[in-house]
């Protein structure tokens, strides 16, 4: 699914109107019918409904929804905010239709002072004040109205976006002046702001409603950001040949683990094997030998000369891919070995965990790295790598894109909607995964998965795409049996077979 900017959304509406053809008013009616159906699926007509409509087209949608709900037997009270006496043309027409229909319990057009209605538990608020066209924080009376709605016990459903939330960058927005919806009914496509963790408090559940905007425009229009879906991943997967053997399925090298962190090398190695690679060689300190040999008998072990740390670079000529970093430690000897390893590496590489922390502490080394590496930081690791001081998710995403460009590589920023930032500036969000995966070792599993895919011959971008989707899908399948609270990292590896089977259906 492509994610369009607010300007592109406007052009999509315009193109649909001109080429379907359909009037803007009839397109608004189509959207209102989809919105009404979605509301009626959630709330019965015994639920009192209060609609707050703004002066623009989002308000026009809300007025049309109010009319349709009232026709279906809902008790609807409507408040249209028209303080500047300037409604959009379609909003004005829907105001006229609503009044002429005489079905709503109450219609109030607010032009000066406003005495807000009592909002109570058991009521439904339809928020249609502002949509994706908003480009500045709410202030004054609208901000006060938002605060009043948020303080109520009523359920809130927002049309397209919660009022006050902008469709893209909210780094300078005012949190108190944004509606906190229980359900957001967004039209045609998700917006970029919906992919940011710090905006989830406003969105509630999200439903995307298909209002049949031009498929031709959507297909031919480039978007910087998109969401990876199951159909996209199915198209990328290569069938395993009947005559495949371990030599043809790739050999992966994992450099992982230090004293006390053998578990990281176990997790990465098991995940790598479960992702179908022909052979895995794990380079780890001597102290980890027995743990690794017992925990992962399928792996080939290569022991470092040191007892407790990674200290010597490995010749990668015989390997098809390398993953480095899980549980590695950050000693000075390991840091020196790491940069030497990355400089001499001749195969595709995944850089994770302590390897990222070492690079963050030696930023000058980052300019010496080969191109097309895949970096897999969680948010705090990215902050250290990129020198970010703000915790704003949008700024973090932009910095990840800048870093991908500067390093000529891929930044896979892990999170609920993991974001794959390409060196050309494109961003792909993952649609799988859940909060149960927020547990130690989950990233080590991801490193193993992507390393295996690289070793099997997938290009860097495809390995990262498939890897993060598989990782999240395994987590989604696992919580169906185990729940979120008890999920641990090794469960993700255990559910990889089911994830593959799902994609092969």
Q: What are the functions of these language-model segments?
A:
Residues 112-113, 161-167, 192, 307-309, ...:
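Short acidic loop-to-helix transition motifs that present clustered carboxylates
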Residues 123-124, 129-223:
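Internal gly/pro-rich beta-alpha loop/helix module
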Residues 64-150, 290-302, 311-314:
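N-terminal small/polar loop signature for handling phosphorylated ligands or for N-terminal nucleophile
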Residues 1-82, 88, 183, 194-349, ...:
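Small-residue (G/A/S/T)-rich helix-start motifs and N-terminal tracts that mark the onset
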């Amino acid at each position: 699914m492509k994610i369009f900017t607010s300007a592109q959304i406007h052009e999509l509406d315009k193109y649909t109107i001109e080429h379907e053809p359909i009037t803007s008013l009839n397109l608004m009616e189509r959207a209102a019918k989809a919105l009404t159906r979605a509301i009626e699926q959630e709330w019965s007509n015994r639920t009192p409904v209060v609609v707050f409509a703004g002066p623009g087209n989002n308000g026009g949608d809300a007025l049309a929804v109010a009319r349709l709900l009232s026709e279906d037997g809902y008790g609807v009270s409507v408040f249209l905010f028209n303080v500047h006496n300037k409604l959009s043309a379609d909003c004005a027409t829907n105001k006229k239709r609503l009044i002429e229909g005489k079905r709503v319990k109450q219609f109030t057009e607010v032009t000066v002072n406003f005495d807000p209605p009592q909002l109570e538990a058991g009521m439904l608020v339809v928020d249609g004040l502002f949509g994706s066209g908003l480009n500045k924080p709410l202030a004054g009376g609208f901000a006060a109205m938002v605060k009043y709605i948020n303080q109520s016990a009523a359920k809130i459903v927002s049309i397209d976006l919660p009022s006050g939330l902008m469709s893209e960058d909210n780094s300078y927005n005012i949190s108190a002046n944004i509606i906190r919806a229980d359900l957001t009914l967004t039209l045609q496509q998700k917006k970029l702001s919906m992919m940011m963790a710090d905006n989830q408090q406003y969105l509630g559940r999200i439903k995307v409603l298909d209002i049949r905007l031009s498929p031709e425009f959507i297909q031919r229009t480039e978007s910087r950001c998109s969401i990876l879906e199951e159909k996209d991943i199915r198209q990328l997967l290569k069938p395993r040949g009947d005559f495949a053997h371990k030599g043809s399925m790739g050999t992966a090298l994992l450099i992982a683990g230090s004293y006390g962190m053998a578990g990281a090398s176990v997790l990465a190695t098991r995940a790598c094997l479960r992702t179908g690679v022909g052979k895995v060689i794990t380079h780890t300190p001597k102290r980890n030998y027995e743990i690794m040999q017992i925990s992962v008998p399928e792996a080939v072990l290569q022991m470092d000369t040191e007892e407790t740390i990674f200290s010597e670079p490995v010749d990668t000529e015989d390997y098809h891919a390398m993953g480095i970093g899980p549980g590695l430690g950050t000693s000075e000897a390991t840091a020196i070995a790491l940069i030497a390893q990355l400089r001499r590496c001749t195969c595709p590489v995944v850089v994770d965990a302590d390897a990222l922390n070492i690079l963050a502490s030696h930023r000058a080394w980052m300019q010496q790295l080969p191109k097309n590496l895949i970096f897999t930081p969680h948010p705090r690791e990215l902050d250290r790598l990129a020198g970010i001081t703000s915790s704003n998710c949008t700024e973090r995403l932009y910095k990840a894109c800048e870093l991908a460009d500067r390093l000529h590589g891929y930044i896979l920023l892990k999170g609920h909607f993991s974001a794959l930032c390409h060196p050309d500036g494109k961003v792909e969000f993952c649609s799988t995964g859940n909060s149960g995966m927020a547990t130690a070792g989950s990233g080590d599993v991801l490193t193993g998965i992507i390393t295996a895919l690289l070793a099997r011959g997938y290009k860097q971008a495809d390995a990262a795409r498939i890897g993060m989707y598989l990782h999240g899908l395994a987590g989604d399948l696992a919580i169906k049996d185990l729940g979120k609270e008890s999920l641990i990292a090794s469960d993700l590896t255990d559910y990889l077979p089911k994830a593959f089977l799902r994609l092969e259906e």
